[in-house]
Amino acid sequence: MELSTVLLLLGLCSAGLVLGSEHETRLVAKLFEDYSSVVRPVEDHREIVQVTVGLQLIQLINVDEVNQIVTTNVRLKQQWVDYNLKWNPDDYGGVKKIHIPSEKIWRPDVVLYNNADGDFAIVKFTKVLLDYTGHITWTPPAIFKSYCEIIVTHFPFDEQNCSMKLGTWTYDGSVVAINPESDQPDLSNFMESGEWVIKEARGWKHWVFYSCCPTTPYLDITYHFVMQRLPLYFIVNVIIPCLLFSFLTSLVFYLPTDSGEKMTLSISVLLSLTVFLLVIVELIPSTSSAVPLIGKYMLFTMVFVIASIIITVIVINTHHRSPSTHIMPEWVRKVFIDTIPNIMFFSTMKRPSRDKQEKRIFTEDIDISDISGKPGPPPMGFHSPLIKHPEVKSAIEGVKYIAETMKSDQESNNAAEEWKYVAMVMDHILLGVFMLVCLIGTLAVFAGRLIELHQQG
């Protein structure tokens, strides 16, 4: 009993499908009996075919800043009425809608005007949905590669305003009129990009009159997309490493000059920065229309490192100066030894000694005590015989020479210590200056644009 019921139901379903297929086959054969796909679907040639166009954005595939091409995945919805494709559902078993190949019917030749690469027209001919009133809905998928003027001035904190201009290629506004389905594209199925976010999307209809035919309008629908770049990738991989290189450059001035590693560290930082820039150069748009923010910051970092090397050479040269080659100007002594240490509170820095030996150690006339060892002033006109003794006089001259040499060496050492002290003061000043320049330079490059984006919300 149950088996027979199942077989009966299957038979009824099969019969329904066969009848439905027969009705649809008969309907399609009747509709296309005398149909021409090259003739506009109007009863009077003076009538205008009204085509409704809607754009559904599915995915933002790629933004090529160099070639200024935006690749998108879209669905282009087109609707119109073909009076040749109407029928009475009662005559065909209640069939109200059918799907037919789009190649078999007349279609508006809607193309992407600002196409940059590939095909201008839609190449995927999917089936259309046709109802008994002659209303046709065609939603083919397409990959559009549209031209977009990429402005890289604020890269990577940039916004781009790109557009898609759609219109019929051969029909003017007097025979085919295209109308936007909505004043903005459909973003209900949009898949978010990891690099871009769409802030605004609008559509406008334009009437364009060309000089060849000033009375004939040509219609187009232009969709504008305002896209903002997500800068996190560039902040982590470019900006922060450059900032760290700048701080590392500043630490060169904290390294003691006597260690002999100042230039080694400076050159190492420069080489590391050069290799880093060679690696990340492909991430930056290679265009000459403008210098992007990130390019300015990388240039600032490079100049910053090179300037530190040049100044380090000057500091090392100052550190190793001696009185035999350089005499310290009075203004240098006054500024770097007397003034700046007091202003900057260098209390832990030991200043070089400036005591000068002003008294002569020996004079030409030496008072020698009496041979008996009793001190006392010599008589008037008396000269000690020891002074006139050649051996004693030679010994005195030797001692005098040694004393003068020691005095000269001491003064030379004091002068050298003064130059080292000046170099140390320069190091401390430059450490603070370079740290400050690093922060101010970073803020000067990026702060203006970040404030502008914050105000825009």
UniProtKB/Swiss-Prot annotation:
Location, primary (coarse class): membrane
Reactions mediated catalytically: K(+)(in) = K(+)(out); Na(+)(in) = Na(+)(out)
Upper taxonomic lineage: Eukaryota, Metazoa, Chordata, Craniata, Vertebrata
Membrane topology, record value: Multi-pass membrane protein
Assembly behavior: One of the alpha chains that assemble within the acetylcholine receptor, a pentamer of two alpha chains, a beta, a delta, and a gamma (in immature muscle) or epsilon (in mature muscle) chains. The muscle heteropentamer composed of alpha-1, beta-1, delta, epsilon subunits interacts with the alpha-conotoxin ImII.
Disulfide bonds: C148-C162, C212-C213
Record SUPFAM superfamilies: Neurotransmitter-gated ion-channel transmembrane pore, Nicotinic receptor ligand binding domain-like
UniProt keyword annotations, A-Z: Cell membrane, Disulfide bond, Glycoprotein, Ion channel, Ion transport, Ligand-gated ion channel, Membrane, Postsynaptic cell membrane, Receptor, Signal, Synapse, Transmembrane, Transmembrane helix, Transport
Signal peptide from the UniProt entry: 1-20
Compartments, as annotated in UniProt: Postsynaptic cell membrane; Cell membrane
Protein name: Acetylcholine receptor subunit alpha
Species whose genome carries this gene: Mus musculus
Similarity field: Belongs to the ligand-gated ion channel (TC 1.A.9) family. Acetylcholine receptor (TC 1.A.9.1) subfamily. Alpha-1/CHRNA1 sub-subfamily.
Stored PANTHER family: NEUROTRANSMITTER GATED ION CHANNEL
Entry function: Upon acetylcholine binding, the AChR responds by an extensive change in conformation that affects all subunits and leads to opening of an ion-conducting channel across the plasma membrane.
Disulfide bond found in the keyword field: yes
Molecular-function annotations in GO: acetylcholine-gated monoatomic cation-selective channel activity; transmembrane signaling receptor activity
InterPro entries, alphabetized: Neur_chan_lig-bd, Neur_chan_lig-bd_sf, Neur_channel, Neuro-gated_channel_TM_sf, Neuro_actylchol_rec, Neurotrans-gated_channel_TM, Neurotransmitter_ion_chnl_CS, Nicotinic_acetylcholine_rcpt
GO BP, one annotated term: neuronal action potential
Sugar-modified residues: N161
Residue ranges crossing the lipid bilayer per the database entry: 231-255, 263-281, 297-316, 429-447
Parts of the chain on the Cytoplasmic side: 317-428
Topological region Extracellular: 21-230
GO cellular component, one term: cell surface
